[in-house]
């Protein structure tokens, strides 16, 4: 079975699949059309059409500019001239076996809630979340005493799939099951649209990974999230 025909094959290169598909409206594309990245404030991730093609790397370098930081996922060692700033082992989990369920306490979050969302993200560090990330999909939150204490939503949208992301709970409200309830609420929204859920997590975040596995997520692959600096052509 070819890579293209395997079920879920788009998840092998999810950022590219999203930017070349459902998230095309958020994409900035290289002049050769072989690399793309999310617009500023949306997500720091970039992608290559074919990570084995040197022309795609050159296209990404031209798109980002010399000496700029970019984040990629699941890619091989970059060509000479690229500096690796950070490498984070991760897991990619398939959520097709997870049962979605609407959450009565969940409220739909939008642009007006971004300041509170950013505050919660700063406190809990679930991963990259910018001023425009909320535009990528459905985000739900739970408030206590008028204060946002937990949230979860969608990020990458490869065709037929949606990534559950920004799952976080205020430290004072952990242990109440809020994360699991919000994940199921997002899964329900994803399934209602006819898509399947998946997610990424840092491999070292064993507590979160354990929660996801207990909910029915299954390990699909183990990508690496890599922060790179583009070649400094002026050097």
Label the predicted regions:
Residues 55-60, 175-191, 209-214:
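Conserved acetyl-CoA-binding loop-helix of GNAT-fold acetyltransferases
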Residues 83-95, 200, 218-232:
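Conserved catalytic-core motifs of GNAT/GCN5-like acyltransferases
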Residues 128-138, 142-170:
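A conserved beta-strand-loop-helix scaffold within acyl/acetyltransferase catalytic domains
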Residues 164, 197-201:
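Conserved hydrophobic beta-strand within the GNAT/NAT acetyltransferase core sheet
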